[in-house]
Structures are given as C-alpha cells and as structure tokens.
C-alpha cells in the first residue's frame, strides 16, 4: 500500500531522490522554502539538462505536481524510502550519495569537454593539412583520439555511469 500521509505529512518528501530503472543518474531534490515545496530535477545536469525547479502543491498530506489540466500525485512507500511519480520510481538517497553523483557527473563532463576539444583539434589539424575526411589516414587519426578517450570513459564509469558519453564513430565495432 502506498501512503503519503502520516508523520510529517508532505515534509516526508523533503530530501534527495535518485531515479531508478534508467541508464543515467538523475537526482531530484525536494525542498521546502518559506512554506512552499519545490522539486529541483536533475541537480547533476548541465546545459539543456540542467536543474529545473518546479513548484509543488500539498494536497491531503501528499505533494502533487500541477500540470495545468490536473494534479499528478507523488506517492511514497510505507517506509518513505521510495517515491513514485507517473511511471518513475525514485529511491531516497542521503546528501553524501548526492554529492558523489554530482562530483562524478562533473568528472564525466570534464572528460567529455577534453575529448571534444582534442577531437576538434585533431580534425582541424588534419583538414588544414589537406587530409580528406574520407581517407583511411583521417579515419585512423580520429580513431586514435577516440580510443584514448573511450578507455578513459570506461575507467571513469567503473565508479558509475556517465549521463552523457560521446559517440565514438571511428572505432572498430
């Protein structure tokens, strides 16, 4: 049975929640400021995926998201450690786990930025030397950069999946 009321009412939702059953580490924070509840989605994200804040409403001791056409409830498990929203399941995590996920995702973004810069640099170097993009020389040069970073991503992802990893199109499949 899912319940949202009981001790603390809507305050039971406050904390960090990691989405389950997906191939990324999405962490949402539910917080209360000046009597209002907010959901800050994807606190480890950046760019278009950066944290987005949504106002939540309290209704009968549970939090709901107003969609403009109705309210969608956030449901809590009896123990308060699992939250359900639409088809998603979220597990409560502590601040240390959230910090670890955020730090890991920052490392992933940093590695991706380095890859993009080196990849673009190699491309420019080769095209400035008039190496055609359809030649084996070009493909091998680009694959060399991809191999270097594919290995680094593989090592980094031993500690957790990166939310975004570049597609390595020149590596042998």
PLM-predicted stretches and their roles:
Residues 2-4:
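C-terminal motif of bacterial Sec signal peptides marking the signal peptidase cleavage site
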Residues 6-8:
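Bacterial signal peptide processing site
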Residues 11-26:
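Tryptophan-anchored aromatic micro-motifs
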Residues 22-69, 148-151, 158-160, 166-170:
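N-terminal glycine/threonine-rich, aromatic-flanked beta-hairpin/loop signature
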Residues 75-87:
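Short, exposed beta-strand-loop hairpins at the edges of beta-sheets
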Residues 84-121, 147-171:
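Edge beta-strand at a domain terminus
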Residues 119-137, 162:
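Charged, low-complexity interaction regions
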Residues 136-148:
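Intrinsically disordered, low-complexity charged/polar segments
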């Amino acid at each position: 049975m899912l319940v949202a009321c009981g001790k603390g009412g809507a305050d039971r939702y406050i904390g960090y929640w990691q989405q389950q059953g997906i191939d990324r580490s999405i962490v949402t924070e539910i917080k209360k400021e000046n009597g209002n509840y907010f959901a800050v989605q994807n606190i480890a994200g950046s760019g278009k995926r950066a944290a987005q804040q949504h106002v939540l409403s309290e209704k009968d001791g549970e939090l709901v998201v107003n969609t403009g056409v109705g309210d969608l409830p956030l449901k809590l498990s009896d123990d308060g450690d699992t939250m359900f929203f639409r088809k998603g399941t979220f597990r409560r995590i502590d601040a240390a786990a959230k910090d670890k996920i955020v730090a890991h995702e920052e490392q992933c973004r940093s590695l991706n930025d380095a890859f993009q810069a080196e990849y673009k640099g190699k491309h420019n170097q080769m095209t400035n030397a008039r190496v055609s993009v359809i030649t084996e020389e070009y493909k091998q040069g680009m694959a060399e950069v991809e191999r270097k970073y594919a290995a680094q991503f593989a090592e980094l992802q031993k500690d957790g999946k990166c939310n975004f990893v570049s597609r390595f199109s020149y590596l042998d499949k």
